[in-house]
Amino acid sequence: MLTLKAVIFGAIGTISETSELQRQSFNAAFAEAQLDWHWTAQQYRSLLLTNGGQTRLHEFRDADPARHHVSDADIEKLHEAKTRLYVQLLTGAGAVKLEPRPGVAELVAQCLAENIKLAWCTSTSMENVGSIQTALNGQLPLDRFHTVVTIDKIKRVKPAPDAYVYALAQLGVNADEVVAIEDTPVSISAAKAAGVYCIATPGATTAGQDFSQADRVLADLTGLNTEQLRHLLMMHLTAPMTSHLTARKAKL
């Protein structure tokens, strides 16, 4: 019998809008390293087509010969500085407080009440996850998520399916028993590569990108409940069977 056993939240932006804070942290790291790099909001939107902060740094450097003097070791240090500055923004004096995206807290609460397992399937560090939990100030019970996937637990970042394969194993469920929620095309590719039904909720910095791989696109999770998720999953899983039966009847 088809059933919904788990909901997987993907990238950080599915939980809370943090991309602008991350952009500011990258720029602060560049300034700290005395680099004349500065990412505008428009540039960062384009960079988000690639997953993983270090990968973005590598791609940005490699795109212009004038930046090739920055070594791989320098990039690693830049990313470490960005993480430190980002964590300070969320946990230090005068820390920024985050809000869950619309509908997230309600859906999480309903899943917990119905014993539907929860996972957070990121490509970020555990340090970043911890700082986000602090900045959410108890608004989301992330400690009750069955598993949180971080960069140290996988070999390849999204769009590779590694994070989802790991999450499914930790949850003890099959891909066809899960709904994923993602906010970037590259992360959706990872979910689909793992065979997981995926709902896209584009964020402030990813709206307008190509979400055609998603099974469904929503502005946010407002009003979305577990009964609707079950229905969407069932319709998705039975669609090939229905199409096959219809085609067979037509032949007869």
Residue ranges and their predicted role:
Residues 59-65, 117-125, 148:
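N-terminal-biased segments
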Residues 73, 77, 95-102, 123, ...:
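Residues at secondary-structure transition points
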Residues 26, 95, 104-134, 191:
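Substrate-recognition element of Asp-dependent hydrolases with the DxDx(T/V) motif
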Residues 2-4, 109, 125-127, 131-252:
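Asp-based, Mg2+/Mn2+-dependent phosphohydrolase catalytic module
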Residues 20, 38, 69-72, 98, ...:
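Non-catalytic, surface-exposed connector residues within folded enzymatic/regulatory domains
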Residues 2-102, 109-114:
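N-terminal helical cap/lid subdomain that shapes the substrate entry/recognition surface
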